[in-house]
Amino acid sequence: NSNFHATADRGNNILFCSYTPSGGTFTVWKANGVNEKPQKYIEYKTGTNIRFGWKISIQGDLDANALITTPVFQKDSKVQFARWRVVNGVLQTQDPEFVIMSSSLLTSNWIKWADVIYTDDTDTQSDYFLASHVTDTSAKRYFYWFKGTDNSIKAANTGAPGNTIINAVDYAVFNKVPYVIYNQVNSFNYAVTGSDAVRMYDLSSGSFDNQIVVCPDKIYGGLENSGQNTEGTGDVVFKAAKNGYYLYVYLVFSNGGIACYQYDCIDM
């Protein structure tokens, strides 16, 4: 369980987190680039009936300012995540703050598949996004945009079938335009080959109205194991080029493929 998930910031830092079942110590290691030996960065005793570590995300740069988030399961039977703040390159505390999301979401479906990321690297009241298997009163799975001021739902996309797992998200601003991306997978044994997909949105209108096609569905997911993504997992990552010309989208699916797509700001 010492290396369950990895993520990177907007600089050159990488975080590795442990999966921590009830009563364990949630540990996060930090490395400055792929050639540096990881060092312990966060150690937090979780207590009983709490699970940490299925996912971890960073908004910002750990050498400057950042917000670190990880979903929390089975704590007080609420839909919530843990948050750490980094200010001027300094982690503010080993103990996280807990953020409780909209009570309209059904906690019975708040299980291991989830990811959370903020839109700002310093403002804890900025908006954030939730990729998860949680539902509201319907049977569908939705990708949620939350208002950070009161942790209520600001917007939800049109939804995916109930057996779909939405479990990874990333957010970036490219040439002053905000973008969000998430994945959706199917871990069940009746999943057809390539059932996994990626969704990306231009958020400049303040809604999910402007979807951008990243790639055709049914070409990268579930290539092995008879088309089954057993863990129901994958990842999506934005990376903007330093020269401002290109935005790269990276995607990966368990038992599936790895791909990179390039977008530019050139108007032909």
Per-region residue spans from a language model:
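Entry beta-strands of beta-propeller and related beta-repeat scaffolds
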Residues: 12-16, 62-70, 122-130, 177-181, ...
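Repeated scaffold domains used in trafficking and secretory/extracellular systems
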Residues: 2-9, 48-60, 105-119, 162-176, ...
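Structural motif
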Residues: 22-30, 75-84, 136-145, 187-200, ...
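Conserved beta-strand positions in repeat-built beta-propeller and related beta-rich domains
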Residues: 9, 16-20, 70-75, 130-136, ...
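Loop/turn-rich, solvent-exposed surfaces of beta-rich toroidal or solenoidal domains
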Residues: 166-201
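Blade-level signature of beta-propeller repeat domains, shared across WD40, Kelch, NHL, RCC1
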Residues: 231-268
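Beta-propeller fold detector
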Residues: 1, 37-46, 92-103, 153-161, ...
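Short loop/turn segments immediately following beta-strands, especially the blade-tip
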Residues: 29-36, 82-91, 145-153, 200-208, ...
